[in-house]
């Protein structure tokens, strides 16, 4: 997959880069013809296709009677009706007969000396003990359990223990602040929280139990807090009326717990994602359909084989961690690598040292991490042996062509397959992705749909399908909103306790379609290029943040009267957070102090990862005469699209002169990159 230096960026983007023939012969899917045949069957005969895959990938307690039911319009999508299954059994028990001593979890902590290997047998015993402990606390089928843990094996045990007994887990990212945790625990009605004393990341201790102590004061429904010792430092407070030392309590329970056989459509987990209304949505994923889709995408997209060491750099607090650290790999009997640290600690060579140390074969990370590593001398990348690598993956946001080429050349050394994966929390697994050894790639394009995914490019205003037809209109590419016209097994079934919101968000904008919320370009080769959100959601380093949630946090600061938040192009993160704030009348303070206070408020309310990159203090915001903030104008200003032609008509603004002021302010704090 080498690229000659003479080619221009545009030529590189449009040129098809073919996988080496030697690579293709060893893959699960080894030719374009095989992909086309399987894809055609998945679209034209979905019941036949998914019936075969459900029997190939999953072990059932009792068989299903119907492969699929329902439609987008009715919001009653169901898969593998009346089947009985247990996700924990599929991820652990069925591997014990032949692979009990195989490493299931390969963990490396914040320091490189913190390495732990957990076999399938050991994982089975840990999960069973924790399952029995939860049962002793009255947790059972349908109960919700909040998990607020660092990226360690304990998080995996906790998820699988819930799955084993039919409890519904709600994993909360350990970077979230107190108010974000409260809203999720309250919405999910969790009676039990599983946490740890502290996390350790980038050389810094992260207080976890301390935050949960605050949460418990405001969530009276919580009855028990299980506390694992992660750092073991004597820094936390312990309330014996509610807190339980989990490590010690588990020793009082048997290392065997029979799995509870569940209906295919019983909820497996709730995972909260940002919504444009400001209130996070608790997306509900169910048992069989989700597990099948996670396992199948993991095996095919990463071309996973039994001897591989598969590594995903995500956090279990996000859907990528759920699907591609935990459920997909373990359902396939894989060795899955989990990492508590950061790519830059203690040096920017950390990722590649881990690849050499553990002989990692598949490496899945975010464009943000890649771009951050590109800033450092190439010697950090070159000093480690990366010959074990076979597949490199990108996730969380579109990868820009420059980062794609750097990843391909300096990490993959021109011999690895690169899979730029597009998907969402809602989808459960990959929607658009290359397949190693099969799909010719273009830097920056997610390429082709996965099996069962029938994509449509729609006109955003009319909802009509757009077509490329060079013979009629000379059109060689089209742009519109990305929609999907057929259900797939991994799709989230609902928003927890708010099915109407689920329908309104995804199923009503374009009748008969699932609306992704993303814009897309389709080129004449049939390759899809994701162009970003079309709703009020910002994608920062692969984390989706609702602008309303950010604005609410800013206005929660005592000095802020009004706030408007938009995304802007960011070299490292993909999108940065740009906030425009007005202050309460009469408030006078040094602007740098004001900005510091506002950033601190967002860190406390949502979490450090949501801190605005740029805050502009302004006497007023661009509004229509009816009082509506014109975020379209703010987005253009953030992108330096500030000519009269680019801004469009601003005559409807109550104070059009504020636009000039904001253009001047933004030009001083956000440099033009081109």
Curated annotation (Swiss-Prot):
One of the GO biological process terms: acetyl-CoA biosynthetic process
UniProtKB keywords: ATP-binding, Ligase, Nucleotide-binding
InterPro entries: Ac_CoA_lig, ACAS_N, AMP-bd_C, AMP-bd_C_sf, AMP-binding_CS, AMP-dep_synth/lig_dom, ANL_N_sf
Domain of life: Eukaryota
Family matches, as Gene3D superfamilies: 3.30.300.30, N-terminal domain of ligase-like
Binding site for CoA: 201-204, 320, 541, 603
EC number: 6.2.1.1
Binding positions (ATP): 396-398, 420-425, 518, 533, 544
Catalytic activity from the UniProt record: acetate + ATP + CoA = acetyl-CoA + AMP + diphosphate
First-tier enzyme category under EC: ligase
UniProt cross-references to Pfam families, sorted A to Z: ACAS_N (PF16177), AMP-binding (PF00501), AMP-binding_C (PF13193)
MF GO annotations: acetate-CoA ligase activity; AMP binding; ATP binding
Family per similarity comment: Belongs to the ATP-dependent AMP-binding enzyme family.
NCBIfam families: Ac_CoA_lig_AcsA, PRK00174.1
Stated name of the protein: Acetyl-coenzyme A synthetase
Organism listed in the record: Dictyostelium discoideum (Social amoeba)
Gene name for this UniProt entry: acsA
């Amino acid at each position: 997959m080498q690229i000659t230096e003479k080619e221009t960026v545009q030529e590189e983007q449009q040129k098809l880069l073919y996988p080496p023939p030697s690579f293709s012969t060893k893959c699960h899917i080894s030719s374009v013809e095989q992909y086309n045949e399987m894809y055609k069957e998945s679209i034209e005969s979905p019941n036949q296709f998914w019936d075969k895959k459900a029997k190939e990938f999953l072990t059932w307690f009792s068989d299903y009677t119907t492969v699929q039911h329902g439609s987008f319009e009715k919001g009653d999508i169901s898969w593998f009706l009346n089947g009985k299954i247990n996700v924990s059994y599929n991820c652990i028990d069925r591997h014990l007969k032949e692979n009990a001593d195989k490493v299931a979890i390969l963990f490396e902590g914040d320091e490189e000396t913190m390495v732990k290997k957990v076999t399938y047998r050991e994982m089975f015993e840990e999960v069973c003990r924790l399952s029995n402990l939860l049962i002793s606390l009255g947790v059972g089928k349908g109960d919700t359990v909040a998990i607020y843990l660092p990226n360690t094996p304990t998080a995996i045990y906790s998820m699988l223990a819930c799955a084993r007994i039919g409890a519904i887990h709600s994993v909360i990212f350990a970077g979230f602040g107190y108010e974000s945790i409260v809203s999720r625990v309250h919405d999910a009605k969790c009676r039990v929280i599983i946490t740890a004393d502290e996390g350790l990341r980038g050389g810094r201790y992260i207080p976890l139990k301390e935050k949960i102590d605050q949460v418990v004061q405001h969530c009276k429904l919580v009855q028990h807090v299980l506390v694992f010792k992660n750092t073991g430092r004597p820094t936390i407070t312990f309330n014996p009326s509610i807190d339980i030392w989990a490590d010690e309590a588990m020793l009082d329970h048997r290392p065997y717990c029979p799995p509870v056989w569940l209906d295919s459509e019983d909820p497996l987990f709730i995972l909260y994602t940002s919504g444009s209304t400001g209130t996070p949505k608790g997306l509900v994923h169910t048992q069989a359909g989700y597990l099948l889709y996670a396992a199948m995408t993991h095996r095919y997209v990463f071309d996973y084989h039994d001897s591989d060491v598969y590594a995903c750099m995500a956090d279990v607090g996000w859907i990528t961690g759920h699907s591609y650290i935990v459920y997909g790999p373990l359902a396939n009997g894989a060795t899955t690598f989990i990492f508590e640290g950061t790519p830059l600690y203690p040096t920017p060579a950390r990722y590649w040292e881990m690849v050499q140390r553990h002989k990692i074969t598949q490496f899945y990370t975010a464009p943000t991490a890649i771009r951050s590593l590109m800033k450092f001398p190439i010697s950090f990348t070159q000093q480690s042996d990366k010959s074990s690598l076979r597949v490199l993956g990108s996730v969380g946001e579109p990868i820009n062509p420059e980062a794609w080429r750097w990843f391909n050349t300096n990490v993959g050394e021109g011999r690895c397959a690169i899979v730029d994966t597009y998907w969402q929390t809602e989808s459960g697994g990959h929607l658009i992705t290359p397949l190693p050894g099969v799909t010719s790639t273009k830097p920056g394009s997610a390429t082709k749909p996965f099996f069962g995914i029938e994509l449509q490019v729609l006109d955003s205003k009319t909802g009509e399908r757009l077509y490329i037809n060079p013979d009629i209109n000379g059109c060689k590419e089209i742009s519109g909103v990305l929609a999907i016209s057929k259900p797939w097994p991994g799709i989230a079934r609902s928003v927890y306790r708010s099915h109407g919101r689920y329908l309104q968000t995804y199923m009503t904008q374009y009748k008969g379609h699932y609306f992704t919320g993303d814009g897309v370009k389709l080129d004449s080769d049939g390759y899809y290029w994701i162009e970003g959100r079309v709703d009020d959601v910002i994608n920062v380093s692969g984390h989706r943040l609702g602008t309303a949630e950010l604005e609410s946090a800013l206005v929660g600061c005592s000095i802020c009267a009004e706030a408007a938040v938009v995304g802007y192009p960011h070299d490292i993160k993909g999108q940065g957070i740009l906030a425009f704030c007005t202050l309460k009348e009469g408030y006078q303070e040094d602007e740098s102090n004001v900005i510091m206070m506002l950033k601190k408020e967002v860190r406390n309310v949502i979490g450090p990862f949501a801190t605005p990159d740029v805050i502009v203090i302004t006497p007023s915001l661009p509004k229509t005469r009816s009082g509506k903030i014109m975020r379209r104008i703010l987005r253009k200003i953030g992108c330096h699209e500030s000519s009269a032609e680019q801004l469009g008509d601003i005559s409807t603004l109550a104070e059009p002169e504020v636009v000039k002021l904001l253009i001047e302010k933004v030009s001083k704090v956000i440099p033009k990159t081109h």
